[in-house]
Structures are given as structure tokens and as C-alpha cells.
Amino acid sequence: MEHTHAHLAANSSACGLGFVPVVYYSFLLCLGLPANILTVIILSQLVARRQKSSYNYLLALAAADILVLFFIVFVDFLLEDFILTMQMPPIPDKIIEVLEFSSIHTSIWITVPLTVDRYIAVCHPLKYHTVSYPARTRKVILSVYITCFLTSIPYYWWPNIWTEDYISTSMHHVLVWIHCFTVYLVPCSIFFILNSIIVYKLRRKSNFRLRGYSTGKTTAILFTITSIFATLWAPRIIMILYHLYGAPIQNPWLVHIMLDVANMLALLNTAINFFLYCFISKRFRTMAAATLKALFKCQKQPVQFYTNHNFSITSSPWISPANSHCIKMLVYQYDKHGKPIKVSP
């Protein structure tokens, strides 16, 4: 993320918002880090109990958000801009910048396979367990993490376009456009297309009911996450492109205020998922309360019964468990490696 304070430290108007950014980012870190750690704990329990692919994706998302909060909010904004009030040496600073882009790309792109997972569950329910299962999900998550890191290496040469002596080059334009496409335009296009198909599919079924909280709740969480992401990240993308191609802004104080607000909104996305899960899912809310209660009382949580082989008819909302005997289909269970095993009903 761009520095908007450190390089103007000598100027009395270095930060137009005064102490608002340091207070905001401190609050965001103190709120978001424990919330995401608690989310990891709860989702780890749900993954062990239910062997659901969507829980694995949400778990990976929480882990990526923790990395974003550490590298961007703590190291970049708080440590470098407000505590040290100076930039790190060039090479370590650029390495940290690569890790920042890697973490933010992972946080965004891990939602894409989750969207595909929900699309298959809703639109192709009978194929869901042959396509999406824990072993494959873990491979997809690992691939996303590795790919996002490797594709973030070119951001070692990411320009600081907000300095007064910045000189635009063609390589900088390419990097900026790649950033805008990879973190916003392409993911939002995928979210919009697949979510539109899901909504269309749901509305076509007049007898649709959210039977079994799995698909209904997870799909609602997906819609909420993607909608909030598109809203909170839009100001940052607009600011970057406007500053790159728009008319020169004579008031740098106003520029830095606008960028500060845009960055604040974008990073808010990494700290609020826990509260969205609690609001939407009663199961998650109950487990969060039990975990916090056990934590404050220094007690072990009661052992939850679960089976290593998770039987499931379907994750589709179209099929009621009461009516599943009317449908000719296969029942799947998972082996110890998380791969589905076909068992005749």
C-alpha cells in the first residue's frame, strides 16, 4: 500500500486527517486481529466436524486477512509511518511491499473458488460432491496462496505515485493496471456473473427454501462478503486511476486525505468478516460464544462429536432431507485423505 505520511513527515500538513489514521488503524488492528484469530479457531473446529469445502475456504480467507492486518496495517502504516516515522531501507521496504501485495491478493482471490464452490452447490447439486471435496479444496487453497505470492514479485518495482516528484513510466502504468485488474475488476466480474446466476437459479424455484443451513447460510455469507468488498475497494481503485490519468491536483493535502480515506475503507474489509458470520449464522454465533466463554474461564471446550467419514446427500437447497428418498442418487463419504468414496444408498 502507498505511503502517505512518512515521506511528508517534515511537512506540518503531512497528514490532513491528523491523528485519525493512527487511531483508526490501531483500532482496526486490535479489533480485526483477535476477530480473525477467533474465526480461524471456530472454522477449524467446523472443518474437523463437517468436512465442508466452504468452511475450508472461509478458514483460508481468515488466515489471509491476518496476514493483511500484520503486513499492511501494523508493519506499513503503524510501525513505519507512525512509530518509526521513517521509511525502512529500500530493499527490506520493497520485500515487505511484495508481501503486502501477496497477502491482499490472497485475501481477495481466495473468495473466487468459494464463489465457484457455491455456484456448483446451487446450480449443479448432484455433481457437487464429485467436484468439490476437502482434499481438492486444500489443493486449490494452496495453489491460490502460491500463485498470489509468485504474481506479487513484480510489485517489487511498484511506484509511489503519490510523491510530488513522481515521474510516470510505461512500466508503472502496466503495474498499476495489473493491480487494478487483479484486485478489483476481474474478481468483481467473476463475483457479479456467478452470483447473478445463483440468484437467477434461486428465483426460478418457486418452492425454494433454505433447508439445511449449509448452502443457505454460506451463500448468504458469500453474497455479503463480495458485496462489501466491491463497495469498500471501489474508492481506492478510483483514486489510483484518477491520479494516474486525471488532471494534476494542485492541493496535495486534499490528495492525501482522499487516499487515506480510500485505504481505510479498503482495509476495513479484512476486519469485519467475523461479525458478518456471527450476524448471519446461528451456528457460528453459538460456537463463538462458547469459545469466548471457555477462553475467559480458562476451561477446555467440551469435546464435540464428529465423524471422520462425513455422509452427505447433497448441499443443494432444492432437496429436502425428508424427500431425498424420492431421488435416485449416490451417497458420498470421505476417506482419511478427504477424497469422496461412492457408496450405494
From Swiss-Prot:
Keywords: Cell membrane, G-protein coupled receptor, Glycoprotein, Membrane, Receptor, Transducer, Transmembrane, Transmembrane helix. It comes from the Eukaryota. The chain crosses the membrane at residues 22-42, 58-78, 95-115, 141-161, 174-194, 221-241, 261-281. This is Probable G-protein coupled receptor 139. PROSITE patterns: G_PROTEIN_RECEP_F1_2. GO terms for biological process: G protein-coupled receptor signaling pathway; phospholipase C-activating G protein-coupled receptor signaling pathway. Orphan receptor. Seems to act through a G(q/11)-mediated pathway. The lineage of its organism: Eukaryota, Metazoa, Chordata, Craniata, Vertebrata. Belongs to the G-protein coupled receptor 1 family. InterPro entries: GPCR_Rhodpsn, GPCR_Rhodpsn_7TM, GPR139, Orphan_GPCR1. Residues 43-57, 116-140, 195-220, 282-345 are cytoplasmic. Residues 1-21, 79-94, 162-173, 242-260 are extracellular. It comes from Rattus norvegicus. The gene is Gpr139. GO terms for cellular component: plasma membrane. Glycans are attached at residue 11. The keyword Repeat does not apply. It is a multi-pass membrane protein. It is found in: Cell membrane.
